[in-house]
Amino acid sequence: MAYRKLGRTSSQRKAMLRDLTTDLLINESIVTTEARAKEIRKTVEKMITLGKRGDLHARRQAAAYVRNEIASENYDEVTDKYTSTTALQKLFSEIAPRYAERNGGYTRILKTEPRRGDAAPMAIIELV
């Protein structure tokens, strides 16, 4: 089987994976269920590989998947303006150069204690 169903329809599953991938790129570490962590590892590694390529086509492919969310906002006192960085800009300017010498294996999954409500196996997925 090429993917996990995760108890959702295909459109819901794709939306959830896009959201989790974007959240991981912004925060660099998230807590989720073990199955979701294993599933988003594939897409995050693909996005970082696109970021390492760095050309226009790779940027457009990544933009088609990663949500257009603000990763950080900075205030410049001199110009009295706010500057914001999107998740896509962070991927190409900060994350991809960090892994320039690394061939794959950009994420780490750490298993944690089960969730309190339903005892679902939980995990922390983070960028190495």
Swiss-Prot record:
Q: Which UniProt keywords apply?
A: Ribonucleoprotein, Ribosomal protein
GO CC annotations, alphabetized:
cytosolic large ribosomal subunit
Q: Which InterPro entries does this chain map to? A: Ribosomal_bL17, Ribosomal_bL17_CS, Ribosomal_bL17_sf
Q: Which GO terms describe its molecular function?
A: structural constituent of ribosome
Q: Where does the sequence pass through the membrane?
A: none
The record, for Pfam families, names: Ribosomal_L17
Q: Does the keyword Ribonucleoprotein apply?
A: yes
- Which GO BP terms sit in this record? translation
Q: How does it assemble?
A: Part of the 50S ribosomal subunit. Contacts protein L32.
Cross-referenced HAMAP family: Ribosomal_bL17 (MF_01368)
What's this protein's family per the entry? Answer: Belongs to the bacterial ribosomal protein bL17 family.
The protein in question is named Large ribosomal subunit protein bL17
